[in-house]
């Protein structure tokens, strides 16, 4: 029983990482487009809107969602 749950968690972890890799790839493309257009790479308003929207849609703790997304935004800019 425990083993089965751990296998499910392992699969979910792989999916999370795969999705983050895809997100970071798209973010890099967006950064390149912004650089070409000479517009700021960071859009704090958009980031705030994303966090608020996810907090409304998620059953997770709002502070956790904010911390997670801020970490994702930060890492995406460095990817």
Language model regions located:
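Domain-level signature for soluble enzymes in the chorismate/prephenate branch of the shikimate pathway
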Residues: 1-79
């Amino acid at each position: 029983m425990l083993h089965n749950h751990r296998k499910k968690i392992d699969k979910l972890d792989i999916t999370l990482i795969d999705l983050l890799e895809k997100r970071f790839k798209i973010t890099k493309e967006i950064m390149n487009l912004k650089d070409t257009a000479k517009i700021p790479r960071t859009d704090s308003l958009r980031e705030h809107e994303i966090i608020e929207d996810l907090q409304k849609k998620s059953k997770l703790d709002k502070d956790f969602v904010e911390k997670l997304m801020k970490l994702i935004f930060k890492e995406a800019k460095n990817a």
